[in-house]
């Protein structure tokens, strides 16, 4: 403190996720989707994840959003849901059991493409 410098780390400027120079954006996003889907399957179940994926796809088709932006929107929604789930206290000790699946086999989340990591 004697030097007059602020001991806190300086806040970075406006940095967007696509500004990071790790690997191509689509490869990074695909890897992150696979990772987050593996974790989300244990807490939410596949059917709910399919429904969120289909919501993002349908919303993107209505707005003519590119596929990568739709996938990124799905990633952000699942990431926020996991954050809230853990923040509220996850009490799950075993992987998710699909106890609420429809018995006639007509689940609402299987139309269209499959999110990466859920095939």
Swiss-Prot record:
Coiled-coil regions, chain positions: none
InterPro entries: Lentiviral_Vpx_assoc_factor, RetroV_VpR/X
Quaternary state and interactors: Interacts with the P6 region of unprocessed GAG. Interacts with host VPRBP/DCAF1, leading to change substrate specificity of the CUL4A-DDB1 E3 ligase complex.
GO CC field: host cell nucleus; virion component
TM region(s), chain numbering: none
Location of region: Disordered: 98-119
Further details from the record: This is an African green monkey isolate.
Organism this protein belongs to: Simian immunodeficiency virus agm.vervet (isolate AGM3)
Principal subcellular localisation of the protein: virion
Family per record: Belongs to the lentivirus VPX protein family.
Keywords of this entry: Host nucleus, Host-virus interaction, Inhibition of host innate immune response by virus, Viral immunoevasion, Virion
Keyword set includes Metal-binding: no
Protein's recorded name: Protein Vpx
Keyword set includes Zinc: no
